[in-house]
Amino acid sequence: SEMCIRDSIWEADRLHEMLGVPVCAYETEAAFAADDKQNGSLLMMYESITCKVHEVFKDGETFRIGEVPVTVLHTPGHTAGGVSYITPDAVFTGDTLMGYSVGRCDLPTGNSAELRESLKKLAALPGNPDICGGHGPVTTLEDEKRRNPYL
């Protein structure tokens, strides 16, 4: 749920081979997966890491994992291509919203104004879904509204 950078794609090809699942990315991020300079692997890991993207998602698109509908919500800020995945009971927010905090915006393509707008989108979601961030505990939307100073 963030851009196709080194820590997000590290094992993607291997998982594709082992499980037969496609590697998917948001429409603006697919190019990062194949470019070790853009995805930061040469800078941070001293090793070229790339992967092939099989499917590209767009904002508002819905797909299924088994019988579960999953809707893509573009939530830029931590990265320009940040997305959250909305299911009936949970929202997978990556580093946009995570355990009473948010992802940093000082890395390439990060933008604090976009992050604020993304947090408004997430706060406006109906109900009280579980929030499954990229780090920290699973929380709920109501908990985040009460305890997260950024929301």
Region locations from a protein language model:
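Active-site HxH/HxHxD metal-binding segment of metal-dependent hydrolases
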Residues: 1, 6-62, 150
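Metallo-beta-lactamase
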Residues: 38-42, 62, 69-151
